[in-house]
Regions:
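Transmembrane alpha-helical segments and their short flanking loops
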Residues: 131-139
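Hydrophobic alpha/beta core scaffold segments
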Residues: 34-132
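Iron-sulfur (Fe-S) cluster-binding modules
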Residues: 142-145
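Functionally engaged cysteine thiol sites
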Residues: 8, 80, 138
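Active-site cores of enzymes that catalyze phosphoryl transfer or operate on phosphate-rich substrates
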Residues: 10-51
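Single conserved hydrophobic/aromatic residue that forms the stacking wall/gate
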Residues: 1-9
Length: 145
């Protein structure tokens, strides 16, 4: 309908304005386009995978890693078996593609204790710190002998 077309046009103007503001501010990373996310998953997961968040979850993790954010907490809601399969199932593939990635799935369900969740996050942060220190050592200028 005419009203729907007008709303789509207005929405696209708003999206472009937000993307421009984010680009100019240098404080935020502008999210990739839908088309770019579709290209990222080629050969990793099928576009037909529409369970849970489907291929988009994997694509967003790949986007984060390629944008310089290799430390990812993948929160899994209780009772969402498709998201659980796609989220956890793709982590090994992503770690093979991006060896320096640090992805940890955290299950949020009544059976998981808060302490267990916090410990898994702390472990992920410890690995992130260790990786950062290792990268600093590798990039440090070598002392002359």
């Amino acid at each position: 309908s005419r009203r729907q077309r007008q709303m789509c046009i207005r929405d696209s103007h708003v999206i472009r304005a937000v993307e421009h503001a984010n680009t100019v501010s240098n404080r935020f990373t502008v999210p990739s386009s839908y088309a770019h996310l579709k290209k990222l998953i080629t050969g990793v997961i099928g576009y037909g995978c529409k369970m849970g968040e489907g291929w988009l979850l994997t694509a967003e993790m790949m986007e984060l890693i390629e944008s310089g954010y290799p430390n990812i907490i993948c929160a899994q809601p209780f009772g969402c078996l498709p998201n659980h399969i796609v989220g956890k199932g793709m982590i090994r593939s992503l770690k093979n593609l991006y060896p320096k990635s640090n992805i940890v799935p955290i299950d949020y369900d009544p059976g998981a204790t808060k302490v267990n969740q916090e410990n898994r996050i702390k472990l992920m942060l410890a690995v992130a710190k260790e990786n950062m220190e290792q990268a600093e050592k590798e990039n440090a200028p070598k002392a002359e002998e």
